[in-house]
A protein has these predicted regions:
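Conserved coil-to-alpha-helix start sites within the AMP-binding
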Residues: 16-27, 42-46, 169-187, 197
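Conserved G/P- and acidic residue-centered "switch" motifs that form tight phosphate/ATP-binding loops
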Residues: 33, 133, 188
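Conserved pre-ATP/AMP-binding loop-to-beta segment of ANL
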Residues: 98-99, 108-129, 136, 159-165
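Gly/Thr-rich phosphate-binding loop signature of adenosyl cofactor/nucleotide-binding cores
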Residues: 12-14
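Conserved AMP-binding/adenylation subdomain of ANL enzymes
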Residues: 148-165, 173-213, 219
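Conserved AMP-binding A3 loop
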Residues: 125-149
Length: 220
């Protein structure tokens, strides 16, 4: 992204389920100084279009399962972001609508990218939106300090050891996965992904990966 001029303060939007690429975005986009905007895949196109416009997205990364939704959302937004298609081999597939694929974008990257920590810990790291049940969605900004504090708090509250095995049943787009992308990575843990949580998938992950931690809404 830096090779394409994306930098500090630019909003990079994401429409994707729980997949490894979403985690990579949660780590890489803030390292760029840009702002991660992970979006709820269950929202309608008009609402997503409002978010893309209001959040001033310059880049949109989209899992091809949601390509039709993303195309319509962009048409509602009045913006012309760089669209990057994520093709998950375990997903149902879908049409490419972007200028390039996610893997193609990675191939453009500079292996010697010079990471520079934020000059101000209050710089924006992520931009989330409320569900908009009483009107238009409202933007909520996470700072680097806020995300770090929440990530550390997860460790303290759960008394988490090093090397946990975390099952992603909570959407990464929900409050940035409650900051567990950074918590688990900080602890040198293992991330186990489920595109769509189900009883079979959850219990199967328990058996296959010896899961130690997970989060979820009451329905999970």
């Amino acid at each position: 992204l830096s090779q394409r001029g994306v930098g500090k303060g630019d909003t990079v939007a994401l429409i994707a389920p729980n997949i490894p690429e979403a985690l990579e975005c949660a780590l890489a986009i803030p390292m760029l100084g840009a702002v991660l905007n992970a979006n709820n895949v269950r929202l309608d196109a008009a609402t997503l279009g409002f978010i893309l416009e209001h959040g001033e997205a310059t880049v949109l990364l989209v899992d091809t399962e949601f390509s039709a939704l993303a195309r319509e959302a962009v048409s509602h937004s009045g913006r012309d972001p760089l669209i990057v298609d994520i093709e998950d081999p375990e997903g149902p597939g879908g049409e490419r609508i972007g200028e390039l694929t996610y893997e193609g974008l990675l191939a453009e990257g500079a292996p010697d990218f010079p990471y520079t920590p934020p000059a101000d810990e209050w710089d924006a790291l992520a931009l989330n939106y409320t569900s908009g049940t009483t009107g238009r969605p409202k933007g909520v900004v996470y700072s680097h300090r806020g995300a770090w504090t929440n990530a550390v708090n997860n460790v303290v509250t759960w008394e988490m050891p090093h090397h946990p095995v975390y099952l992603w049943t909570l959407p990464l787009f929900h409050c940035n996965g409650w900051c567990f992308p950074w918590t688990i990575t900080m602890l040198a843990g293992t991330h186990v992904f489920l595109r769509s949580p189900s009883a079979e998938g959850i219990y199967g992950a328990f058996a296959q990966h010896a899961v130690t931690h997970l989060c979820g809404a009451p329905i999970i």
